[in-house]
Amino acid sequence: NLIVSAEICEDVWSPVPPSIEAAREGAVILVNCSASDETIGKDSYREELIKGQSARLIAGYVYANAGDGESTTDVVFGGHNIIAENGTKEAKRFANEMIVSEIDIFRLLSERRKNTTFQTTEERHLPKVLFHISVEETALTRSFAQTPFVPQNMAEREKRCEEILMIQAMGMKKR
């Protein structure tokens, strides 16, 4: 039951991107074919925009930008491709190559089940196109920490432990 939705270029930059409604209607993978030109500082803004949209919608967001072969004397395209999963990102700029990453769809769906925003009984209105995709066994391209909830950085670990202790103390205080 994978639902994929597409936006085009500036859709994600708009005040109310179409991906919001698509996510509310069940899309867990959002794709954007873009031709966003390069200006000073735009790359970090673009990364934060895609990362934020992915996190806010608890979705995988695949952003494919025009590359240098499509640049002209008036505009430069850097091929800034981004794959974001619920806020995490993988991006390469001016690399003129394809990027590949995994998106944990089951994790995203699990997170959505815990979020009341996605628990709606409203009727869906967006048009749907059925498709078939073959699933192949592949090696993972990213690694996962054996202890994902324990920060490796000692300062972050101490902060996390303090936070856990305070949450538990406040819970016990209420009893």
Set out the residue ranges of the language-model regions.
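CN hydrolase (nitrilase-like) catalytic-core segments centered on the catalytic cysteine
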Residues: 13-99
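Active-site-adjacent "lid"/gating segments
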Residues: 72-75, 79-175
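Beta-strand-turn-beta hairpins that frame and shape the catalytic cleft
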Residues: 1-6
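Long hydrophobic segments that form regular secondary structure
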Residues: 7, 12-30, 157, 161-166, ...
